[in-house]
């Protein structure tokens, strides 16, 4: 297939599977020997793995939406820059819903063969998402300053007297 045809398949997969949650198209778009390198080993093969990933994400973010900002294709590989948004209304790795909205940039790389995805790699900014959800606190300048002062005092207390 041409690079343009592969880009069209990439767009369709994100629109149908991820944005609409239409899991019935997984067998049509995902090869039986598909490997999702961004998923946990043991749950990363075949169309069923993609159905599981989509269902998990859409459970946590029912209004999940991937906006394709740009695609580059060469041969059988398509690289996409996407903006992902959604509202945390379901469990996310054991964390209860926060009701907060998130917006992140993802990079996804998909290799196609005979009109189906055979490999996927994803680069996500999960720490930023967790910060937006209020699940991770990153120290600000004041807290960092206090931490450094405490650490310096502790280190000074270990120095021999008179130094």
Which role fits each region the language model picked out?
Residues 1-163:
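C-terminal and inter-domain tail/linker signature
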């Amino acid at each position: 297939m041409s690079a343009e045809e592969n880009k069209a398949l990439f767009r369709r997969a994100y629109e149908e599977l991820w944005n609409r949650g239409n899991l019935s198209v997984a067998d049509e778009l995902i090869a039986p020997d598909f490997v999702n390198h961004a998923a946990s080993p043991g749950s990363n093969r075949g169309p069923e793995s993609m159905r599981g990933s989509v269902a998990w994400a859409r459970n946590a973010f029912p209004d999940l939406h991937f906006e394709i900002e740009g695609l580059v294709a060469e041969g059988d590989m398509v690289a996409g820059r996407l903006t992902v948004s959604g509202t945390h209304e379901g469990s996310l790795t054991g964390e209860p819903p926060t009701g907060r909205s998130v917006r992140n940039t993802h990079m996804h790389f998909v290799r196609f063969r005979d009109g189906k995805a055979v490999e996927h790699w994803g680069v996500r900014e999960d720490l930023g998402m967790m910060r937006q959800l209020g699940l991770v606190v990153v120290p600000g300048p004041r807290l960092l300053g206090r931490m450094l002062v405490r650490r310096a005092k502790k280190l000074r207390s270990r120095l021999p007297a008179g130094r």
